[in-house]
């Protein structure tokens, strides 16, 4: 809806599957498109799955055929199949990677020829602190979301000469998907209660900004939105180094390097709640 209020025509893609990718329902996409049209905007509902390259391409083709061009792609399709690592099935791994990472690739790839031809465009990919920091029971989701960061960085570098930008957002929000996250421990239940206070409409202003010409100088960045707080993440950078002229041995690493590095080592059990321990603002 915020895109509409800023003059953008919108292709609403949502096959209407459940939180784990099951089923399908035209209702969510069509309802959103109808709401945009009722408010005086232009919109069209596309029900294709981003996991299918042809379906992903149809999202872009619908935009070009109905509205004449495409200026921004928001890759936010997602499902969850959370389970502890030793119980995760190959199917649960593939399904989550396919929607998040492959879906991001498929839609972005389909838009790229148009962006190159017009020498402009903006990719906005949804990542997660589950990938940036880590989370229990989400090996598939974490891998996909960190993979999206790598994809975005490469797109930003490869497409800069064509005037195309690529950025990531890690959203904190209660949604149809996050509602399916198991909450069995006190810590998980506390996280869910925090998420319930954060709505998706708080993410929209940054998405619209990054899609706009006002953000022409912004690319290859990782942001997060947590209610009224916008966060800029650093990329991994060296924080300590140690040189030994004669080279290292396993014994000297244990005796010298690890004690020197220990104050700066990340905690082994670190999750998002350790980095964001405070209530959303």
Enumerate the predicted regions with their spans.
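Active-site-adjacent segment of SDR/Rossmann-fold oxidoreductases
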Residues: 5-6, 113, 117, 133, ...
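C-terminal helical subdomain
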Residues: 189-281
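Residue(s) in the substrate-gating loop at a strand-loop-helix junction
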Residues: 128
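Substrate-binding pocket helix/loop in short-chain dehydrogenase/reductase
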Residues: 84-85, 92-97
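Short, small-residue-biased leader/transition segments that mark boundaries at the very start
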Residues: 1-2
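Active-site helix of classical SDR
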Residues: 108, 144, 152
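The beta1-alpha1 cofactor-binding region of Rossmann-like NAD(H)/NADP(H)-dependent oxidoreductases
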Residues: 26, 30, 47-61, 90
């Amino acid at each position: 809806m915020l895109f509409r209020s800023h003059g953008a025509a919108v292709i609403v893609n949502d096959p209407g599957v459940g939180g784990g990718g099951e089923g399908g329902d035209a209702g969510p996409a069509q309802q959103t498109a109808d709401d945009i049209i009722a408010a005086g905007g232009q919109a069209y509902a596309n029900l294709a799955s981003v996991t299918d390259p042809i379906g992903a391409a149809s999202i872009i083709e619908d935009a070009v055929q109905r509205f004449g061009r495409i200026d921004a792609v928001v890759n936010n399709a997602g499902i969850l199949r959370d389970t502890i690592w030793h119980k995760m099935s190959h199917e649960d791994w593939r399904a989550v990677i396919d929607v998040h990472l492959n879906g991001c690739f498929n839609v972005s790839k389909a838009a790229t020829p148009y962006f190159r031809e017009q020498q402009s465009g903006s990719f906005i990919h949804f990542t997660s602190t589950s990938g940036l920091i880590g989370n229990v029971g989400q090996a598939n989701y974490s891998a996909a979301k960190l993979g999206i960061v790598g994809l975005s960085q490469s797109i930003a570098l490869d497409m800069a000469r064509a005037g195309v930008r690529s950025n990531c957002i890690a959203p904190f929000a209660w949604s149809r998907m996050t509602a399916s996250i198991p909450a069995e421990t006190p810590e998980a239940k506390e996280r869910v209660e925090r998420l319930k206070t954060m709505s998706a409409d708080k993410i929209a202003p940054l998405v619209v900004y990054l899609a706009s010409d006002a953000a022409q100088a912004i690319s290859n960045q990782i942001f997060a939105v947590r209610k009224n707080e916008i966060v800029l993440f650093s990329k991994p950078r060296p924080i300590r180094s140690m040189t030994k002229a004669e080279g290292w041995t396993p014994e000297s690493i244990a005796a010298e390097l690890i004690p020197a590095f220990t104050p700066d080592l990340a905690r082994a059990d670190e999750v998002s709640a350790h980095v964001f321990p405070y209530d959303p603002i």
